[in-house]
Amino acid sequence: MQEFLASTNFTVIFISLIGIKFLLETYLKIRNLKSIELNKNAIPERFVGVVTEEEYKKSIVYNIDRIRFQIFTALFGAVVLIIFTLGGLFNFLAEIVVSTTSSDVLGAVLLGLLLLIVEQVISIPISIYSTFVIEERHGFNKTTSKTFVTDMFKSLIISATISSIIYATVIYIVVNLGDNWWIYAFGAVFILQAIIFFLYPVLIMPLFNKFEPLDNEEFKKPIEKLLKKVDFKSKGLFVMNASLRSTHGNAFFTGFGKNKRIVFFDTLLKTITPDEMEAILGHELGHYKLGHIRKTLISSLVFGFIGFYILSEVLKSDNFFLDHGLESLTVYSKFLLFYLVAGSYTFFTKPFTSALSRKREFEADDFSFQYTNGEYMISGLLKLSKDNASNLTPDSLYSSYYYSHPPIAERVASIENKLK
């Protein structure tokens, strides 16, 4: 591998991949826009009677606005990445840190913090426009400027704390534990992530939202009956004040082991019936009972293990980092640059992970169908689609590449086939 790393012109490859990624994804988004335009004059047959003409037109305008903004943000992100790397901004930050400390561990923390702050500042206009222009324009935004700023600072502090611990741990291991450091680093990061995942529902999520026990007996009784039927034990049923920020609805469960919690958006409880809620929850429980979470964890471990091995090899090559605009070649600057550019080398895996995710969504629907009423599954999905102004006519290539969930029409058709 070292011969390949030393002889390859990564500058050309890097720029080419950024260009290919942007052009491919822009092409798919334009296809999606055309699909929306082609179907704008008539409500899709399956949604007749579910959405009104006015609601359908609003969803069309909303999705067109979002896709156009996504094209802009993709271009913006590509330009920023090039400025960070080949433009020398990352190297400039690395040189500031090198002049400040000779400690690799402290350097990793300082450079990671600088990178995080710069990225946060750059992303602010994007977040503001998305929240206070697009979401506001279409009636979904409930976020106040105070909540927005508070969320931003909370997120920054939490990200800074977690990333500093991870970066310091990894760099300490790299410097002190010899050639097989990547095995120990992989294990350490896995343990840290497991701890974070365990603590997330009880320490981090409450910093952003209020969680109150579900006390609505009309919803609570059928849900508890379903939990008993599928033998699922949780820490409790909670309602999250999602309406503080948005009118979008959702339900999910978080944590693992004794910290498993089922969470419902308060916005969801206002729009669906208890029977529909039971069917939606049946889907979420399906992911757990069918081992999807365990399988995702195992695949993450495998890819993480491979990723750390590749990192261990790449760190030995100055050429890789010089070709990405880094001249201040410390172990921590190399590590963080690798983290920064890795996405450009792995984006092609997205359609495969999306396809696997959609397969598991169908399986979770099948699980829910076994334990709940299929008719209520359909009506619940249709309501969620309507309330979230989902794209009812997505382009097939676009959805194949991007969608982690099958289009609503496909999920409904699958359930209807089982009802026959």
Task: Describe each PLM feature range.
Residues 331-336:
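Acidic/His/Gly-enriched intrinsically disordered linker/tail segments
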Residues 4-329, 343-420:
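Polar-ligand-bearing catalytic/cofactor-coordination segments
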Residues 337-341:
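Alpha-helical transmembrane segments
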